[in-house]
């Protein structure tokens, strides 16, 4: 954090409570356009040589950089730098007239170097191709209730939508969340511990400070199945007689802050991956989700 004082001495010097996560380096200016184009061409060539079934390859390289200045009451001024880069790969394959597409993306709050590392972009292409190729022989599952085992990674979108949004403070203050009166009560299995952690280096949701100047932190939401609390911005925390958890997020300077997630995820449990599969006599193993929405009132 870069911090300065104006007019009044602040009650709390937030610059001493956490470490600045990112340097003031703009990834957009560090690699010339020609080098980016050469990388995309190399990825395209690699993907098309994987198999004769590959018919189309799409690769995008995205970069964003923000310099944040937050001026709070009392003359407190906070600065932060926020880089963000990402690569998305899409591969389409065709067999006997049937076309399927697979996709994979990766990135984070760092410079472009990790996206340019051969092992990283090859891993992305391989994932996209394998996903598309497997879908060529995929069969429809029977309708009805099914036991579902979720794989790591993107299936976490289900946790994000069905649980994460329901634990954002404003929805609970307004009593529109299914969790609003369940703090201290059991809401999940003993194996379930969920946190919101905005301090993990280089992750998309990780920020030195939130959009109100409050340092990001690791917030326990559900511990061994017991609901411990919610995510708060400053206003919602004040209205609920709580403390801000560093979750004040705003779409832009022209929007008011709201309590929203940073990196929300479930901690590892005591069971190995193979145990979960073995314990399910019949069901679905879901490894990829494309998105979704949920009614937080009903869950």
Language-model-derived ranges and their functions:
Residues 1-299:
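N-terminal small-residue-enriched
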């Amino acid at each position: 954090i870069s911090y300065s004082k104006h007019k009044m001495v602040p009650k709390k010097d937030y610059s001493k409570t956490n470490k600045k996560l990112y340097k003031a380096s703009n990834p957009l200016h560090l690699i010339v356009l020609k080098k980016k184009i050469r990388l995309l061409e190399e990825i395209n060539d690699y993907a098309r040589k994987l198999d004769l079934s590959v018919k189309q390859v799409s690769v995008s390289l995205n970069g964003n950089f923000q310099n944040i200045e937050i001026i709070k009451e009392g003359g407190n001024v906070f600065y932060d730098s926020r880089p963000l880069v990402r690569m998305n790969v899409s591969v389409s394959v065709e067999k006997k007239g049937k076309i399927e597409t697979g996709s994979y993306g990766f990135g984070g709050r760092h410079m472009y170097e990790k996206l340019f590392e051969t092992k990283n972009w090859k891993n992305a292409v391989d994932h996209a191709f394998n996903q598309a190729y497997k879908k060529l022989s995929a069969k429809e599952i029977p309708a009805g209730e099914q036991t579902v085992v979720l794989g790591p990674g993107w299936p976490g979108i289900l946790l994000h939508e069905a649980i994460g949004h329901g634990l954002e403070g404003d929805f609970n203050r307004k009593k529109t969340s299914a969790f609003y009166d369940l703090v201290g009560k059991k809401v999940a299995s003993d194996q379930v511990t969920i946190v919101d952690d905005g301090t993990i280096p280089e992750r998309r949701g990780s920020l030195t400070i939130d959009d109100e100047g409050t340092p990001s932190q690791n917030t326990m939401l559900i511990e061994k199945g017991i609901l411990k609390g919610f995510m708060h911005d400053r206003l919602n925390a004040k209205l609920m007689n709580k403390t801000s958890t560093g979750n004040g997020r705003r779409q832009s300077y022209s929007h008011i802050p709201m309590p929203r997630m940073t990196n929300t995820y479930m901690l590892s449990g005591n069971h190995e991956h193979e145990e979960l599969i073995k314990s399910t006599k019949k069901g679905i193993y879901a490894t990829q989700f494309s998105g979704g929405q949920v009614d937080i009132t009903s869950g």
